[in-house]
């Protein structure tokens, strides 16, 4: 894989997070391919850029502030298609003033069109969502193994 492809996909992921922080639907929507697929969670699974942006605005109404940080990630490129996994951490304040943190990762596929990378699909996998002190349950708790 060319470093330029990985860098361009990393920039896409960071542009997405920046749009979340600034509540910028135009910037956020421009990250998606026209026929993309987004799985935000059970019952929140949509296809097509317009439907994806509509779901995003509905989801964002639950919050008054979000800071999304992109952590580590990996990318595998195969021509004009690629896949990857990116870990994120979000600090948020809900509309009811409840504060919390989200630790999760996205499983992604990407497509290159006219020399530019877009999300072809993103699926959110929540590892933790709860109080900032991490006192809530972890979805990936392996302590019983």
What is each residue range found by the language model?
Residues 5, 9, 48, 102:
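Hydrophobic (often cysteine-bearing) scaffold residues that line and stabilize catalytic clefts
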Residues 1-7, 141-145:
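Basic/polar N-terminal segments that are highly enriched at the extreme N-terminus
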Residues 1-3, 20, 103-105:
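Residue-level recognition of hydrophobic positions within alpha-helical transmembrane segments
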Residues 12-13, 25-88:
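A solvent-exposed, acidic/Ser-Thr-rich amphipathic alpha-helical stretch
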Residues 5-21:
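Short, aromatic-enriched amphipathic alpha-helices that serve as compact interaction elements
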Residues 22-27, 116:
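Surface-exposed helix-capping loop/turn segments at secondary-structure junctions
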């Amino acid at each position: 894989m060319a470093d330029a492809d990985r860098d361009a996909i990393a920039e896409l992921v960071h542009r997405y997070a920046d749009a979340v922080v600034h509540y910028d639907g135009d910037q956020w929507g421009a990250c998606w391919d026209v026929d993309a697929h987004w799985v935000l969670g059970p019952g929140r699974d949509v296809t097509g850029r317009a439907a994806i942006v509509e779901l995003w605005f509905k989801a964002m109404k639950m919050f008054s502030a979000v800071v999304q940080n992109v952590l580590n990630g990996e990318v595998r490129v195969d021509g004009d298609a690629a896949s990857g996994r990116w870990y994120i951490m979000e600090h948020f304040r809900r509309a009811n003033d409840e504060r919390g943190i989200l630790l999760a990762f996205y499983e992604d596929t990407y497509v290159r069109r006219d020399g530019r990378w877009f999300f072809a699909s993103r699926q959110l996998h929540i590892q933790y969502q709860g109080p900032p002190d991490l006192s809530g349950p972890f979805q990936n708790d392996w302590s019983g193994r």
